[in-house]
UniProtKB/Swiss-Prot annotation:
NCBIfam families: MMSDH. It comes from Bacillus velezensis (strain DSM 23117 / BGSC 10A6 / LMG 26770 / FZB42) (Bacillus amyloliquefaciens subsp. plantarum). This is Malonate-semialdehyde dehydrogenase. Pathway: Polyol metabolism; myo-inositol degradation into acetyl-CoA; acetyl-CoA from myo-inositol: step 7/7. GO terms for molecular function: malonate-semialdehyde dehydrogenase (acetylating) activity; methylmalonate-semialdehyde dehydrogenase (acylating, NAD) activity. Catalyzes the oxidation of malonate semialdehyde (MSA) and methylmalonate semialdehyde (MMSA) into acetyl-CoA and propanoyl-CoA, respectively. Is involved in a myo-inositol catabolic pathway. Bicarbonate, and not CO2, is the end-product of the enzymatic reaction. GO terms for biological process: inositol catabolic process; thymine catabolic process; valine catabolic process.
Length: 487
């Protein structure tokens, strides 16, 4: 048997062994194959990374902005040239199909492209005359060393929300990727080095609780970007804030999709199938609940079940596969327990994903419940799996009222051809990202990823102008220039 490779941390431009003696298997969720082992690093590893990032900040923060932008542009080109390999790594580690993985790579590259616009993004503003012979100007500066804590479900896109922008704006960065998907991060670091990034500007420390707490508590780390579950996100926000850091924590979701009687049924069902079961439902923008008007409900449910039955389940590397595995055995068991809870609490199970499980991987098939009510566990909790709940409603107002009862408010979608309904939905739904006649309302890089309520803790969101404000601080200079006598 070949020896299993042990991954290293990437600190100060070098691949270095962790100080730990603890390693965790990195498993292909479609085959249960152990691909490598990732170190569960120590606070000593974090300390070394912070020291390296702090030293690098002294020169990187003063590097000319166009020079930083050129390195980001080089990085974008290298990512584009290696997109097939990046997608393959995502599928091997995460399980999503190749098409979805390529889409994720594209969204990650999009964020690098946006970050490469640093010369424009870093611009301040000025007022030539605020009083006699007095002018004022506002300048942006990087804030220092930034920490990022990323999840397993989007191992490229989510880190690319964080480190390209932070680095382009003059900060240095320490990334803790998910210990379940570290191989993609290894490739991201290799390509960034090839792009010409100086040592210490970007660092990767693998691990779990000790690394997270080390990042949250270290006085030389000035800001934290986090994406993950609500309980962990709330902890990160509180702990980081306690240590006087800027924190943005993007957390859980229970996204509702509303289908009105005038919706184009075929397109609506196709969109919802993709939104509910794409990426095995393991995404914070997944459609978790459909509220459908009674007039179209029976026809909608028939088409939904028909399309769900046609979904091909399997290894994401295989041709034609739509639905890959969930990430681990524990996630599979947790999903099964939610299915059992839904049945126990009175929901009607129309498609049972347990029937599609195989011994080869952590597979759960598309699962659909009808006649769900808001007192049921499957409506309340974020399941993070290919499980869809359907509620039948009398009208749009009832659908919006139901969605607004959720503690989460990440995204919401509406399918209709009625302009008045769209306006009512936009003005009354409690959610930060809305979709009209589309299933996944995730914005592009130049708009903020803006969840509400328990879907976000902080003030400045990821992406868009919010990210520029989050990773910079401002200095206002007011100057008096007495009028000279040129006569």
């Amino acid at each position: 048997m070949a020896e299993i490779r042990k991954l290293k941390n990437y600190i100060n431009g070098e691949w270095v062994e962790s100080k730990t003696d603890q390693y965790e298997d990195v498993i292909n969720p479609a085959t249960k194959e152990v691909m490598c082992q990732v170190p569960i690093s120590t606070r000593e590893d974090v300390e070394y990374a912070v020291r390296s990032a702090s030293e690098a900040f002294q020169t990187w923060s003063k590097t000319a902005v166009p020079r930083r932008a050129r390195i980001l542009f080089n990085y974008q080109q290298l990512l584009q040239q290696n997109k097939e390999e990046l997608a393959r790594l995502i599928t091997l580690e995460n399980g999503k199909n190749t098409t979805e993985a390529l889409g994720e790579v594209g969204r990650g590259i999009e964020n690098v492209e946006f970050a490469a616009g640093a010369p424009s993004l870093m611009m301040g503003d000025s007022l030539a005359s605020i009083a006699t012979d007095v002018e004022a100007a506002n300048y942006r500066y990087p804030i220092g060393v930034v920490g990022g804590i990323a999840p397993f479900n989007f191992p490229m896109m989510v880190p690319c929300w964080m480190f390209p922008m932070a680095i382009s704006l003059g900060n240095t960065f320490i990334l803790k990727p998910s210990e379940r998907t570290p191989l993609l991060t290894e490739k991201l670091a290799e390509l960034f080095e090839q792009a010409g990034l100086p040592k210490g500007v970007f660092n990767v420390v693998h691990g779990a609780h000790d690394v997270v707490n080390g990042v949250l508590e270290h006085p030389d780390i000035k800001a934290i970007s986090f994406v993950g579950s609500k309980p962990v996100g709330e902890y990160v926000f509180k702990k980081g804030s306690e240590h006087l850091k800027r924190v943005q924590a993007l957390t859980g979701a229970k996204n509702h999709t509303i289908v009105l009687n005038d919706a184009h049924l075929e397109d609506t069902v196709t969109n919802i199938i993709g939104a509910a079961f794409g990426s095995a439902g393991e995404r914070c923008m997944a459609c978790a609940v459909v509220t459908v008007e009674e007039g179209i409900a029976d026809e909608f449910m028939a088409k939904l079940q028909e399309k769900a039955a046609d979904i091909k389940i399997g290894n994401g590397l295989d041709d034609g596969v739509f639905l890959g595995p969930v990430i681990r055995e524990d996630n599979k068991k947790r999903t099964h327990s939610y299915i059992e809870k839904g049945i126990e609490e009175g929901a009607r199970l129309l498609c049972d994903g347990r029937e599609n499980a195989t011994e080869d991987g952590y597979f759960v098939g598309p699962t659909i419940f009808d006649n769900v009510t808001t007192d049921m566990t499957i409506w309340k909790d974020e399941i993070f799996a290919p499980v869809l709940s359907v509620i039948r409603v009398k009208n749009l107002k009832e659908a919006v009222d139901i969605a607004n009862q959720s503690e989460f408010a990440n995204g919401a979608c509406l399918f209709t051809s009625n302009a008045n309904a769209i306006r009512y939905f936009r003005e009354n739904i409690d959610a930060g990202m809305l979709g009209i006649n589309l299933g996944v309302p995730a914005p592009m890089a130049f708009f903020p990823f803006s969840g509400w309520k328990s879907s976000f803790f902080g003030t400045l969101h990821a992406n868009g102008k919010d990210s520029v404000d989050f990773y910079t601080r401002k200095k206002v200079v007011t100057a008096r220039y007495p009028s000279p006598d040129f006569n």
